[in-house]
Structures are given as C-alpha cells and as structure tokens.
C-alpha cells in the first residue's frame, strides 16, 4: 500500500486531457512545477472539486431551513423592541408633568391607616381664598389627622361632606416656619350641638399656649389669627348623633398681620367677630369698638317709650326687614304700674332654637336687673306678656340670611292691683298671665313658679312623670328616678343616654371616675321630683369633678368640657341635686 503524505489536485485549463498526481517528496528540489492537468473536451466529463474550494455542481443549499432561522430571529427582535417601547411609555406616563407637585395627592384623600400620615400641602402662590376665586378648588384632605407642614393647606373631617364616622379621634398638627404665625378659617361646620360641646367637638389649641377654642353646632366661628407657628387641631365624635363635619383652610402669615373675612368685624388685637357679635350690647373688643356708632347703624330702629300706651314695629314692617339689625325698645311707665304687651302680624325666620332672627322680651326685677321672659321667632305670635314691674325691654335681632315681614306690637300700662288676664287665663303671683292649659304642667311658666302650685282644690295633683333609672352607669346614685325628655341635652329617652355613655367607658380607668360619673349622670339622667320636674346637679358637684379630673383628662388630650358656673348653687335644696 502506498502512503502519500500530501495530495494536490491541480487544474489549470479545460484543455488538459489527463490528471497528474505530484508528490513533492519524490520530486527533485529544482524540478519543474506540477504540470497543469489536461481535461478532455467532452463536457460530460467532470471532476469533483475539493470541499475547501467551490461547491460541486450537483449540490444545492437548503433554503427553507435558512429562511426559517431568519424568520425566528426577526420575530424575537421585534418582540424585544415592543417590550422596550412599552416600558418606556409606562415610565413616561408615571412621571409627573413639568411644574407639578412632586407629591401629588388623590382627589379622595389619603387612605386612613393606623399610623399618622404626613400630608404635603400645596406650595402654589396666593392665599386659599384667592385660589378659590380664581377657580382653583383644591381637594380637601379628608384623612383622620396628620402633619400639615406647608405654608397653606386645606383639611376636613373624615368622609366630608358626607357624615363623619362615630367614635372618631383625629389630630392634625399644623406647622409653619418659626418666624410666621398661623391664620385658620373654618368654612363649613355641622357638628352635634350640645351645651359646652360635650360630645362631638372641634378643638383648636396653639402650642405650647394650650386650649383656645372649642367649636360645635352649625355656625362656623370667625377667622382665627394666632401668634403661634404650631397649631393643634383635634376632632372628636361619640357613638351617636352625627353631622357632615367641617372643612377648613390655614395659611402662614407674618406675626401681627392677620386679617378678617369681608363680612367680619376686626378688633385692634386681630380678633375677628361675626356680624351677630357687633352692637349686641357686649364689648367683645378690648377698646369697645364693636359697640360704637351703633345708633347710627340702627337708625329708625328701637327707642324709648314712656307713654301709658303705645305702638312700635320693625323697620320696613310688612315688607322684608333689613339684615343685621339690632333694635331695642325700652318701655317705662310710672311706678306702681305693670305693662301688658301684645304682638301682631308676627313673621320672623323660623328656627327651632331661634338662633337667627328673633325677639327677646325682658322685664326688670325688684333689684333693677333685667330677666328674660322669652325668645320668639317663626310665624306664631308670642303669648300676651304682662310684666311684674313698670319696665320692659324688647330686643329685635336679625342675621345676614333670610328675612321676613317682621311684626308690630302694642303695649298698655295698668295699675298693678288690677287683673289684666282674660277669661281663659290665670295670673301669676309675680305678675303676668298664663293660659289655663299651662297650669300644673310640671313646667315653671310663671317666673315665681306659682303656675305649678297645685295643692289647691282647683288643680288636682298631676300624674307623676317619673320613671326608674335604667342606665347601668347611673345606677346606685342618691336617687333612682328620672324624667324624660331631658330638654337640657336634647335627649328623648334613656336609650339615647346609653348610646352616648358607651363612648365614655374608657374613662372608667381614671382615678376620678366616680366624681365624673356623678356629674355626667346628673346631667344626662337628672333627678325627678315628686311633681315630675327634674333637678340639675349642683354646682359643687361639677366643681369637685373638675378639680379631681381636669389633670387626668389633660393627659388624654381633652380639656375640661363643662362650665360649672351654669349650674345652680346648693343654697336652695329644691334648685339642684346631689347625685
């Protein structure tokens, strides 16, 4: 067998007719090169080419396999490009537009969590009022508390303007620059209204000075100008009656540069007053400026009436009376006489508590002080009023809202020894007339209570309206009967009291709980007398509870909620109760 170390196939011309193999190992070094091969002219004759040269004529590539690879690679590339474009578009949509806030807040407010959220307020120029006038209405933050650290901002009760939830305790900390002060305005208010704002309330406290203002009801307070850079706002609700809450704004201002709304009166100490507090007979400003020039403001309204009889009426009588009026008629007749007063064509704005437009009638007592006979409003005229002395004062007041036709009134002086009462009326011992239907109704209609002195044969003893105390928290007091409805706090049944007191179970852990319980039960479940009337707790009960509980409530962030001076003293055992 012949072993070749190298084989070279040389093809030069198509004219070569034969193929020669050359092995350099057997050739001389100076020998001639490999002669060119000679191929026959027959075209049918072919020589296969080496694999490292041109392809043989009889072999073709697999084109279908190549195009399949190209198609797969192209599809993969397009898929990657589409994914990249989608990612870029998503990032562009998520990015805030130029000039927008870096911490945008949703229109519905932040979701309330167990931790106190931090709320970044708007940094745009202009006051909140200016923003509203320009048509920009920022969405109020309805979260339950938080930190308000911007130079201005809005906040509101949870769910506003829908009713706020029960058992709520929200705390907002308003913080502005230390060289600025805070101005705050409550634009809308609807919170359960009870004396001293005992149940639902909004408290404003500039820190570290302490409590300043407690708010409830439906009338927003005037603009508040403070001298503090940190304001604490607390909103508390119990488990029963609800309202739609409040909506407020604040802004930073230079100290001493506060302002008031266009319909408010400004005192020189940056105190703002509502129109109802101007020319009301009480100096609210330190310089008394709110009670000056009142006669010019209410010209043709009120006056002194000294004749034995006379007539007076509201401005623009039988037409719409003006807004923001304060008229006072002083009726004075000779001593030894009394005054009978009657109203005609009575038409004032109606409201359950006569808070807006109303008439008040006062009479003088033996000491010369004025005492209130009654406040009246609506379309039903007041009853005939008879004074026990020779002086009466009639006060007519209107607000800036609804107006009506007003009234006219006549008065007549008569000798105090005469009886001016009609056939269906009985006279009070201290003077005045009351209808027979009001006698022995367990309510003191006469100022001296003589209408309920029912021991005589004319009036049989009334049926007792007392009922057993059923409120668990108030069992074991010095009395065991009460009477409802309770007009002091506006509760109809004891079941309502149970619902209210359920929000105060947390106070049972306080060392002063028993003192606070006596006061709270004395107010909500008052003592019932044998005649069916009720007695409030004595002032000493309230003062003792305040002394024992004030510091403990302060630790809970709640100031003392009662004004003890509104309760009677214990000098008269029939005037108050010791629960």
UniProtKB/Swiss-Prot annotation:
SMART domains: CUB (SM00042), FRI (SM00063), LDLa (SM00192). Changing residue 259 to D: Requires 2 nucleotide substitutions. Residues 111-121 have a biased composition (Low complexity). CDD domains: CRD_FZ, CUB, LDLa. Residues 100-143 are annotated as: Disordered. GO terms for cellular component: apical plasma membrane; membrane. The chain crosses the membrane at residues 70-90. Its main location: membrane. Residues 259-295, 420-455 form the LDL-receptor class A domain. It is a single-pass type II membrane protein. It comes from the Eukaryota. Residues 1-69 are cytoplasmic. Residues 122-143 have a biased composition (Polar residues). GO terms for biological process: embryo development ending in birth or egg hatching; eye photoreceptor cell development; retina development in camera-type eye; visual perception. Glycans are attached at residues 227, 415. It is found in: Apical cell membrane. Residues 461-579 form the FZ domain. Keywords: Cell membrane, Disease variant, Disulfide bond, Glycoprotein, Membrane, Microphthalmia, Repeat, Retinitis pigmentosa, Signal-anchor, Transmembrane, Transmembrane helix. Disulfide bonds join 144-170, 197-216, 260-272, 267-285, 279-294, 301-327, 354-377, 421-433, 428-446, 440-454, 466-528, 474-521, 512-549, 538-576, 542-564. This protein is produced by a bicistronic gene which also produces the C1QTNF5 protein from a non-overlapping reading frame. May play a role in eye development. This is Membrane frizzled-related protein.
